[in-house]
């Protein structure tokens, strides 16, 4: 990241802001999602999301996508697709969102997780950034064991793109042991 920090072509996200968005539900506003609905998302999603097996996320490779973002690749073995499926079954709003998601086709969900590191600013040379990233295309960052899925609000402010992420709920992934009693 140090190679990119002083480049006018790129705005880097602060490390505490790094995350994986496994389903983007909408915007917190009266015409999309109201705050009163957020609790129902948790209540409806949690029993299903607990069924997802804990997994290890393999993080490797720096790349550029959509001509606008720089990201780390993440291999979850399909676990986030399973979480998306469970959330869709439990939460009508997620069902509606995924019904219109171009990543969900008749052949299945093609979602692949990634961790956005930064975004192009529109200034300078994109080729210069890609050249700086070339040595890191096959970078192996490591493995991260995941035991919880989070429901969070990512604040988007015009004056500050990286406000603290507001975690609304953390849901333990229990896999086959999800039937083992009360979990809240």
Name each model-derived stretch.
Residues 1-184:
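Histidine-dependent nucleotide/RNA phosphoesterase domain, centered on the 2H-phosphoesterase fold
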């Amino acid at each position: 990241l140090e190679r990119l920090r002083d480049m006018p072509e790129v705005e880097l996200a602060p490390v505490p802001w790094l995350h994986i968005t496994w389903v983007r539900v909408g915007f917190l506003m009266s015409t999309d999602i109201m705050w009163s609905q957020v609790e129902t998302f948790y209540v409806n999603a949690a029993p299903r999301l607990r069924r997802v097996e804990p997994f290890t996320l393999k993080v490797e490779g720096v790349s550029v996508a959509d001509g606008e973002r720089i990201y780390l690749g993440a291999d979850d073995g399909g676990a986030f697709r399973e979480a998306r499926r469970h959330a869709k079954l439990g939460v009508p709003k997620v069902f509606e969102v995924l019904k219109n998601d171009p990543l969900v086709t008749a052949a299945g969900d093609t979602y692949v997780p990634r961790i956005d590191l930064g975004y192009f600013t529109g200034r300078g040379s994109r080729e210069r950034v890609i050249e700086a990233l070339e040595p890191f295309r096959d970078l192996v960052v490591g493995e991260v064991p995941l035991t919880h899925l989070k429901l969070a609000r990512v604040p988007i402010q015009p004056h500050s793109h990286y406000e603290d992420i507001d975690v609304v709920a953390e849901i333990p992934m229990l896999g086959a042991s999800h039937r083992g009693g009360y979990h809240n």
